[in-house]
Curated annotation (Swiss-Prot):
UniProt xrefs under NCBIfam families: PRK14658.1 (NF011252)
Name of the coding gene: acpS
Keyword Coiled coil attached: no
Protein EC: 2.7.8.7
Entry protein name: Holo-[acyl-carrier-protein] synthase
Length: 115
């Protein structure tokens, strides 16, 4: 077993967060569907930044080469679940925090070696 941790911080005013093409590069399946259902550009920007930070934190924690399309972040009532290649990774815990300027995502877990 191996303890893993990944963290990512994103500034809200990043220009690419306003770009639907960037959203299509980062988001998949349910994430993309949810994104396009949001009404305001502020909500879209916040959601995209959140998922982007989460996926970056997952990639850093696992230290493996995955694309954004390989990772799905699913928010449930009690937590955010991480799916890797459509398989739930129960060993990872994801936390996210917001300020007026930044979003930070942190992932920790105790996993079997994935190499």
């Amino acid at each position: 077993m191996k303890l893993v941790h990944g963290i990512d911080i994103i500034e809200w005013n990043r220009e690419e967060l306003n770009n639907p093409l960037f959203a299509k590069r980062i988001l998949i399946d349910n994430e993309l569907e949810y994104y396009f259902q949001l009404n305001s550009s502020r909500e879209k920007k916040r959601y995209l930044a959140s998922v982007f930070a989460c996926k970056e934190a997952v990639m850093k924690a696992l230290k493996l080469k995955y694309g954004y399309g390989d990772i799905l972040i699913l928010k449930t009532e009690n937590q955010r679940q991480v799916y890797l290649n459509k398989i739930l990774i129960k060993e990872l815990e994801l936390s996210i925090s917001y300020t007026e300027t930044y979003i930070v995502a942190s992932v920790v877990g105790l996993i079997n070696n994935m190499n």
